[in-house]
Amino acid sequence: MDALKQRHLKLLYRQRGSASRTIDYDVVIEPELREDGDLVTDSQLTEQDDQSFPDIQVPSPDRVDDFDLNQGDGLMDKATANEDDIDHVIGDEVAAVNAPVETSDLVIDTTQFDSMTLSQLSTPLTSMATIDVLRRLLETVILVTIEERTSQFNRAGSARLRLKLKLEIKILTWFLHQSKEDLITISELNLSNNDLLYRLKQISLLKNSLSRSLLDVRSAISSYEGPNNALSEEQVALQNFKRINELILSQRIDTIINNNLPPDTSTFDTESKKGLLPTLKTLNESLQNTIG
């Protein structure tokens, strides 16, 4: 009992020293916790540290509520050995939970979004604010719970209770980390969704503006092409008439030229009694008669 009194007296000195630096703080010596709620003496702590306790299988986080800490008949060597091994066991369980899940059979019906407008597809600001508030609230509650479990762990005298509290702290820490990551991912997805919808809306507005500009340009082209088409048709008709007149005139000129040409003297008719050949023959005969 003297050792216990001295231990509590030292604890009182430490608490008074820390309390002197604060205000409105009552100095209270909290007793060590046991599963049965009774106080623990130094001799009892020594006996409990030497005792073994049943082997406890660490469950996955989704089966923590149904987990019985009293299950199993196997015995462990030391309570401290269990506390060191629990980190590896929990790490294996967390890795199993985080293993990739086959999603080949997962089919999402996207046709339900075809009839929705851009405003219906966007995430409201109230929903995004709710996600952020939920994340902060969950973080605050779990951190407070972890602090309570840590305080109980530091004051626990039973090895079984220390292991139970350490397991709870590990599970709560893992759950807080995963929940924060999931909620942050959901918020980022909603932000990306709203950003893409905003860009799509801007593209739709630009498309409508360009369509109206194209209609205006086509209307202006039609207004200019109407008179120009009529003029071009008249010009084509005049060009056709001009070509016809030129062809007729060229044919008439060719006919007149052919009629005014002299007779062709390259060929002679030997039987004809008119022309140059008979005259030459007559002159030749006259010369022969004169000479002869």
Curated annotation (Swiss-Prot):
Residues 268-292 are annotated as: Interaction with NKP1-NKP2. Transmembrane segments: none annotated. Pfam families: CENPU. It comes from the Eukaryota. Its main location: nucleus. It is found in: Nucleus; Chromosome, Centromere, Kinetochore. GO terms for cellular component: kinetochore; nucleus. Residues 42-63 are annotated as: Disordered. Residues 129-247 are annotated as: Interaction with OKP1. Keywords: Cell cycle, Cell division, Centromere, Chromosome, Kinetochore, Meiosis, Mitosis, Nucleus. InterPro entries: AME1 (IPR048743). One of its GO terms (biological process) is cell division. Belongs to the CENP-U/AME1 family. Component of the heterotetrameric kinetochore subcomplex COMA, which consists of AME1, CTF19, MCM21 and OKP1. The COMA subcomplex is part of a larger constitutive centromere-associated network (CCAN) (also known as central kinetochore CTF19 complex in yeast). COMA binds the centromeric nucleosome-binding protein MIF2, and to the outer kinetochore MIND subcomplex, probably via AME1. AME1 interacts directly with OKP1 and an NKP1-NKP2 dimer. Component of the kinetochore, a multiprotein complex that assembles on centromeric DNA and attaches chromosomes to spindle microtubules, mediating chromosome segregation and sister chromatid segregation during meiosis and mitosis. Component of the inner kinetochore COMA subcomplex, which connects centromere-associated proteins and the outer kinetochore. COMA interacts with other inner kinetochore proteins to form the inner kinetochore constitutive centromere-associated network (CCAN), which serves as a structural platform for outer kinetochore assembly. This is Inner kinetochore subunit AME1. It comes from Kluyveromyces lactis (strain ATCC 8585 / CBS 2359 / DSM 70799 / NBRC 1267 / NRRL Y-1140 / WM37). The lineage of its organism: Eukaryota, Fungi, Dikarya, Ascomycota, Saccharomycotina.
